[in-house]
Amino acid sequence: MLVHHVRVNNIFDGVIPYTREWLLTKNFYIENKKILDKQRLGGYCIWKPYIILTAFESIQEGDVVVYMDCGDIPSTKLRKNVYDHMSRHDQYLIQQHPHNKNKHFTKRDCFYYMNCDEEKYWDAVQLEGGFMAWKRTERNVQILSEYLKCCTDERIVTDIPNQSGLDNFDGYVSHRHDQSIITNLQVKYDLSKVDGWLDNTGAGAFIKWNALYHKDGVEYSNGSKNWDENGVLK
């Protein structure tokens, strides 16, 4: 549905669906089989930076790759929103609600083994991992490569108990895997981000989150509203 929606509405210049079947043909899968065969998020989403770097191979310097979870649906207005932002910045990363502190959704080992175990990382607002845009630049290739390296370290990305001997923070809920990693990297490199939690003025106005997830047979979308005929939320 996502691929068809993007193509029919010409939201972006092209769309490439990446599947589990595609992943199984890659050396990346063989090298990281232990993590990728875990059921949780199809292998803790460690394929995400790999997919973005793979897509970089088919575009020119300065072009933009947009990653989007297959369960989300973009408004037709998203193209302009992303284009306007990326004309001034090299990344489009979506910040969650300000109450979602990184330390409550990141296990301690993720901070420790990324050399990010300090207050500015703990208290950062966590990013949304289901949508992001990256301009192909040499710096972004380096950052995404670091993202990928961290994602392939089971101490950092998986739910195994902390190996560092450090405890999780008070108020810890659960680990958010690749999302925790990209949040640490955003703070480390001061990457560009936008508000996503404001329905009408933030990125949340242009994306229907988890639109294809079903609960009790009924489609729902994390409370998102419907769009009007102009492609924006009512």
Could you tell me what each predicted segment is?
Residues 1-234:
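Glycosyltransferase catalytic domains, chiefly GT-A lineage
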